């Protein structure tokens, strides 16, 4: 059986990894850790205005700069996944990692469907009630559309 574990770097998502490890050891599951980088994340947006001329047009060099920034963001996500694998004890468990670029909930669902995962193990990050009401959380969207069971590890869970 295969577990899909989305990681965002928060302590809550690390606890979800720990829960997935517990299940993998007990039931001989494999684990795939994914980090989904939103295409227009906060680091990207910080630089976006610098790529525009006074008339709003995109400066020609900005395409190359944008690609470099995208690569930097993906490299950071890959380092995060590597650090998690090296810090936690995955001995005896088949583990894969992958960085995906796109809308987090959509990429999680796409990975779950395309690779036939048996379960998604993820955290429920703490959005404010107002923000959750208007935009919904990634976790809520994954739960409502997932092709497999979703185990939600509460932010207060401590393995």
Show the residue positions of the predicted features:
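Small/aliphatic-rich secondary-structure junction motif
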Residues: 1-63, 89-91
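Short, conserved glycine- and acidic-residue-centered signature motifs
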Residues: 13, 74-77, 135-139
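Short, conserved clusters of charged catalytic residues that mark active-site
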Residues: 15-18, 103, 137
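Conserved beta-strand positions in the Rossmann-like core of class I SAM-dependent methyltransferases
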Residues: 32, 96, 151
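C-terminal alpha-helical "lid/dimerization" subdomain adjacent to the S-adenosyl-L-methionine
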Residues: 61-72
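Gly/Ser-rich helix-loop-strand patches that form or flank binding pockets
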Residues: 106-159
């Amino acid at each position: 059986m295969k577990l899909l574990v989305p990681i965002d770097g928060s302590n809550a998502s690390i606890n979800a990894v720990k829960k997935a490890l517990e299940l993998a050891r007990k039931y001989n599951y494999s684990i795939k850790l994914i980090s989904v980088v939103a295409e227009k994340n906060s680091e990207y947006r910080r630089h976006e205005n610098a790529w525009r001329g006074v008339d709003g047009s995109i400066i020609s060099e900005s395409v190359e700069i944008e690609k470099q920034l995208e690569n930097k963001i993906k490299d950071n996500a890959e380092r995060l996944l590597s650090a998690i694998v090296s810090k936690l004890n995955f001995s005896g468990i088949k583990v894969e990692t992958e960085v995906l670029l796109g809308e987090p909930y959509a990429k999680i669902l796409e990975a779950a469907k395309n690779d036939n995962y048996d379960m998604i193990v993820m955290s429920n990050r703490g959005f404010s009630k107002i923000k959750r009401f208007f935009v919904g959380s990634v976790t809520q969207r994954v739960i409502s559309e997932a092709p497999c069971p979703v185990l939600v590890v509460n932010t207060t869970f401590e393995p």
